[in-house]
Amino acid sequence: MKEKLWLLFLIAFSFNAYAQDVPPPNSLYVATQCFVNDGATFAEVVEEARSADISGPNSVFFRQPVAGNGAAPNQFTRVVVWDNMEHWATNVLIVPTESYTCDNANRSFWANRVLGTNRNAYDGTDVSLVTTRLCFIERGHTIADVYKSLNDGALAREAMGDTTMSMVSHLFLGPSTGTDMRTRIIIRRIGDSEAGLARSLDMLNEGDVGIGTPVNVPAEHCQDAALTRSYIIRRNN
């Protein structure tokens, strides 16, 4: 009996320790691949989406590839930001569209955590640049380990004058063919403006950039970052 109680104590302690190591997600990101319909332009897509009556989510962004990873010429990503799964489940609405089509059957759901202290993405603008890098958590490590190392890196960059907002997103629902569950992450950086992110990239390229996984991050198989131009479609808070 004492052994069972001791085991339960250890399990409870380990869960509490994990909870203290990593903050809860700041938001839920639901990402969907979308395509501009024949005869339409991306500008028309943005105009149509901005005129739609969408009151449920916190924010909606359309991200158009600039330096993508094999994206089709008419492809873009719709990112819808919610508080959590309950917020999504009680407010989600698929609005009919004319100028674009989205693959709503293959949405991906990401627990999103903000890194560092910068919170000034899209500062005075509704368009900015975003980089995203896909990585996989190393076996034997957790999102808490990844968060801590990435957060330390973000704080160090901010101390050097970096104005970008950094995030790490952790996939928990959606397509992830050929990988272990809950290992896929995206490291995201959003500029306070297009020029702001460009300056940040210039600063990173001034020194010894290195190769492979970001230094001290317990992740593997990191891809080169993709660059998108991100348009605010709606912000409800």
Stretches found by the model and what they are:
Residues A19-N237:
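Short S/T/G/P-rich N-terminal loop/turn motif that feeds into the first structured element of a domain
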Residues K4-F13:
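Sec-dependent N-terminal signal peptides
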